[in-house]
């Protein structure tokens, strides 16, 4: 990293290892694409300061690939380059790999589902001048921290990055389904609320290790944006946006649900009282 960015030797080793050296961005196919991208970008970014090199790299990405919706598994960064097309998740995989190929820490972030409409989006973040900044992948702007999704992301209930294995999270872990973990990055984009949820028995005894799913209505289905377990005090905390969430809590054969508006409340107690959740009909505020 000293050879490429002489003025950026302050990049922490952990960030460099996790967001430059590491080979994977998300669930994409893996090929040896970095030497190919480096050969294309080396002269183009030579002599530039780090931020200017980031912006120039994104211009190159826009020249090489454009958006096209797909439904298959996320293709490799090299496949996006050779095909010239990819959905937002694939464009961001491509852009992150291009940036990593020239020694710039980069990662993918995404809103798994928007709160205000039926859709989602993924983009990139880069480490520059001591902090993380965002950019639209293959959607170049003249400055960092600007993109068409700025207003949309400000209404989000969750935006997250992904880490693998023993990599250290730089925020609250919102789910840990397998060898990967989702990390909450929402505070960079939206006003947030720390929603405290307490799960108790009917007599008020805290329920430890209850499964809690925080869900968002999108495409006529409830989609989990975070899954956690209650602690020994029956408590779980989620940093989220301002809007409506469907919360589902269960332990063994007991289950309770609720719809919470985080614009009005920041704490709620739910009681595990029965074997099945009662059906309810309420409005979601988006």
Task: Outline where the language-model segments fall.
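Structured interaction patches on ligand/partner-binding surfaces of diverse proteins
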Residues: 252-277
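Conserved "repeat-terminator" motif of extracellular CCP/Sushi domains
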Residues: 188-190, 270-285
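A short, solvent-exposed beta-strand micro-motif common in secreted/extracellular proteins
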Residues: 243-254
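Short, ordered, surface-exposed loop/turn motifs in non-cytosolic proteins
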Residues: 202-221, 242-243, 286
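A short, amphipathic beta-strand motif
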Residues: 193-203, 282-285
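Short, acidic Ser/Thr/Gly-rich low-complexity loop/linker segments typical of extracellular
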Residues: 218-240
């Amino acid at each position: 990293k000293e050879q490429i960015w002489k003025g950026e030797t302050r990049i922490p080793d952990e960030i460099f290892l996790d967001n430059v050296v590491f080979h994977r961005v998300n669930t994409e196919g893996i090929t040896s694409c970095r030497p190919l991208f480096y050969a294309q970008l080396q002269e183009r970014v030579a002599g530039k300061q780090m931020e200017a090199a980031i912006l120039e790299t994104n211009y190159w990405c826009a020249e090489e690939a454009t958006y096209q919706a797909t439904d298959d598994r996320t293709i490799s960064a090299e496949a996006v380059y050779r095909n010239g097309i990819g959905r937002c998740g694939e464009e961001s995989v491509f852009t992150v790999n291009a940036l990593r190929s020239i020694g710039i820490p980069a990662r993918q972030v995404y809103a798994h589902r928007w709160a205000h409409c039926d859709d989602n989006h993924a983009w990139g973040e880069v480490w520059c001048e001591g902090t993380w900044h965002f950019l639209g992948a293959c959607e170049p702007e003249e400055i960092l921290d600007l993109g068409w999704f700025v207003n949309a992301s400000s209404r989000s209930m969750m935006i997250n990055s992904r880490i693998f294995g023993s990599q250290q999270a730089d925020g609250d872990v919102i789910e840990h389904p397998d060898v990967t973990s989702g990390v909450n990055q929402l505070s960079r984009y939206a006003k947030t609320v720390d929603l405290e949820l307490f799960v108790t028995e009917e007599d008020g005894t805290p329920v430890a290790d209850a499964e809690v799913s925080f869900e968002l209505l999108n495409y006529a289905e409830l989609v989990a944006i975070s899954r956690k377990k209650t602690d020994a005090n029956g408590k779980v905390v989620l940093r989220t946006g301002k809007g409506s969430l469907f919360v589902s809590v269960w332990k063994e054969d007991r289950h309770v649900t609720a719809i919470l508006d985080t614009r009005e409340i920041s704490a709620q107690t739910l009681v595990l009282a029965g074997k099945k959740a009662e059906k309810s009909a309420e409005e979601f505020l988006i």
